């Protein structure tokens, strides 16, 4: 988009409770639905999410009643501890103490400005891995910025490392305190308010490429080419023969990058 501030990109809804004491807060839901072109679809999605959460709640209660609270919470703690132990070994085996560097670029922001550099350094300090984005370009006046939450980046790293190096590791957030993420304020990945953010997914794709470039340096067998990164978004809308508004939205994903074992598959999600 050509937005220069986040206020130009739509209504900002802060975290709100849609249910309080198991009672739906209709005014909150209606506020969201009234800002949607397809409120019926969105209400259906919302109802599906609520049904899934109620099922999960029921299953947790069943486990706690069957095994007792102490056993249930002890099991949760053990799952977190098991993940942390496995990730600690993985970090020690795959991340060197010497700094590794990798950078990639967003070629253009859609308004003719760019390229924008995303740079990251990675190294191990005792049992902790450090990711430092110092050297990343300053925030843009366009909407290409991506406010990267440090905890979210840890999740990205954990999924990547487990899937690439040891898929047998059970995934949860037990390893989070084994990672430290440093993102300088005022950069493309931590812009100051009121920076526009609506085209942030272009930076997200580059972050995965940077992560792959960093981890692949330590083990060339897992080094892969760059991914497709940018995704075209297709919107189809209009009025059907009954005069009802319709809207279809599709994201076109590209191919998976090649690696030492062979070529990656072509476009896989069109």
Residue ranges, per PLM feature:
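Glycine/proline-enriched, intrinsically flexible loops and inter-domain linkers
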Residues: 1-270
């Amino acid at each position: 988009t050509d937005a220069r501030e986040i206020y130009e990109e739509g209504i900002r809804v802060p975290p709100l409770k849609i249910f309080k004491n198991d009672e739906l807060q209709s005014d909150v839901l209606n506020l969201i639905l009234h800002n949607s072109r397809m409120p019926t679809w969105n209400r259906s999605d919302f109802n599906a999410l609520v049904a899934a959460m109620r099922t999960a709640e029921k299953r947790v209660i069943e486990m706690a009643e069957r095994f007792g609270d102490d056993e249930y919470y002890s099991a949760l703690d053990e799952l977190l501890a098991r993940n942390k132990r496995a990730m600690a070994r993985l970090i020690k085996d795959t991340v060197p103490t010497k700094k590794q560097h990798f950078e990639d670029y967003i070629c253009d922001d859609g308004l003719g400005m760019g390229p924008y550099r995303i740079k990251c350094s990675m190294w191990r300090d005792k049992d902790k891995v450090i990711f430092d984005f110092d050297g990343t370009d300053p925030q843009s006046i366009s909407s290409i910025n991506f406010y990267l939450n440090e905890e979210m980046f840890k999740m990205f790293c954990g999924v990547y490392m487990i899937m690439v190096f040891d898929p047998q590791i059970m995934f949860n957030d037990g390893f989070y305190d084994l990672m430290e993420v440093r993102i300088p304020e005022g950069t493309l990945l931590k812009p100051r308010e009121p920076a526009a953010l609506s085209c942030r997914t272009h930076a997200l794709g580059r972050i995965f490429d940077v992560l792959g470039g960093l981890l692949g340096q330590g083990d060339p067998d897992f080094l892969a080419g760059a991914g497709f990164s940018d995704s075209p978004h297709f919107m189809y809308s209009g009025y059907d023969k009954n005069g009802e508004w319709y809207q279809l939205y599709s994201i076109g994903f590209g191919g998976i990058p090649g690696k030492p074992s062979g070529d990656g598959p072509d476009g896989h999600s069109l």
